[in-house]
Amino acid sequence: VTTSAKDPYATFSPDELASRPTVFRDGLFRDQVIVVTGGAGVIGTALCVLFGRLGATVVACGRSRDRLEELSRHLARLAIPHSTDALTIRDPEQVSAFVDDVWERHGRLDVLINNAGGQFAAPATEITPKGWSAVVETILYGTWYASQAAARRWIAKNAPGSIINVSTVPGLVATGIPHTVAARAGQIQLTRALALEWAPHSIRVNAVGVGVVSGPSLHHYPPNAKPFFEANPMRRLGDVVDVAEACAYLAAPSGKFLTGVILPVDGGGSVWTEFWPLGKSDYFRVED
């Protein structure tokens, strides 16, 4: 589905992603291996296509085998070297085995992009323990498991590495998504802590603070949240290409002196923090 300013629920097709102009040179990531968790989602697909067209071998993982197979068909048609693996990012043993397999198959791992996530909007009193755990474990635990597994291999092999966490606007506080707010806050602080601890091993750890980007996932919010999708100084939604190119900037030599950075890709949303995932209740309205 083609994205447009009029349809916040649409996104780019893989073919459209592959044909869009980019500021990055061809072959920028040639001979590199890039792992993308949550690789079959809309942001994950954009990451796979961009890094692939810039020369990388892409390894995508995710929960849904069917969605990964669909992604694989698209990447094959675009002549992007790749492989896909179905796994549960919330299972540390599966994640560790997956990272081992990447090294065994490819002999290297250059960049890990922790993109797996997910959320739903609901009043805090109605979120079940299962719903809370699903979001927090996917975002925070999944980032930790994958980062630790990758770093262990890099350190053991005395190899440099780069970790990029696809996160959200730093300091975001919003009603209706307390599980996501908690998980993302932990993910951002984890980014900073690991950047400090792993710097002696030439492992850079950064994050992209993503604002509201167009795509089908916005259907998870009720209609009265729609007016707040563009609650940023640029008064528009971002798109998946904005996120993918920010990650490429951090992964490329352009980011070689960056670690512990949370790069906002949010249209200035971090300085205009009004976001109401369940819509704005009358209690918070200020009359003129």
What are the residue ranges of the model-derived segments?
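Conserved glycine-rich Rossmann-like NAD(P)H-binding loop of the short-chain dehydrogenase/reductase
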Residues: A56-E70
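C-terminal helical subdomain
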Residues: T3-R20, P200, A207, K226-L258, ...
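Conserved glycine-rich cofactor-binding loop
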Residues: V33, A40-G41
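Active-site loop of short-chain dehydrogenase/reductase
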Residues: Q32, R108-L109, W154-T168, P200-I203, ...
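Conserved Rossmann-fold SDR core element
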Residues: F51, R108-D110, I188, A195-S214, ...
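Substrate-binding pocket helix/loop in short-chain dehydrogenase/reductase
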Residues: P123-A124, T128-V136, F228
